[in-house]
């Protein structure tokens, strides 16, 4: 809303729907067609690392450009690409990293992912209201960098998926 207001444009439900259609299309195409090709070509861990870095850069860009409507629109759609690849490769990694039955591993992973989706609005709204519209994106970018550091720190225990 803030970026639209600053740009002097009316940005209602229809316009928001177009943006999230673009996001969803990028997510679907990248998760079904691009992610499998990337993991076959480069391997799981290099793709995870690249996606974490790329998605972190997109979120940082949103942090910088939170007040510019064009930047927000383009980067939200680009975030769909990274989300699609990351969802596919992370699901693949979770399934390979455990000896639990696939349905248990899948539902556990989905539960954690949806928990994050439930917490994010409750955290990002107050962050944006009190510290500025770009702060939730910075928080997200930082959390992806921390997850990358955790991945590197635990790489010896991840031998099953390397």
What residue spans do the PLM features occupy?
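Intracellular helix-loop hinge segments at the cytoplasmic ends of transmembrane helices
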Residues: 87-97, 110
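Helix-to-loop junctions at the C-terminal end of transmembrane segments
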Residues: 30-44, 128
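A late C-terminal transmembrane helix in Major Facilitator Superfamily
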Residues: 100-129
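Multi-pass alpha-helical transporter architecture, strongest
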Residues: 141-162
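A membrane-interface helix-boundary motif in multi-pass transporters
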Residues: 126-144
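Small-residue-rich transmembrane alpha-helices and their cytosolic helix-loop interfaces
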Residues: 20, 24, 52, 106-114
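C-terminal transmembrane helical hairpin of 12-TM major facilitator-type secondary transporters
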Residues: 45-90
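Loop-to-transmembrane helix entry
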Residues: 7-26, 104
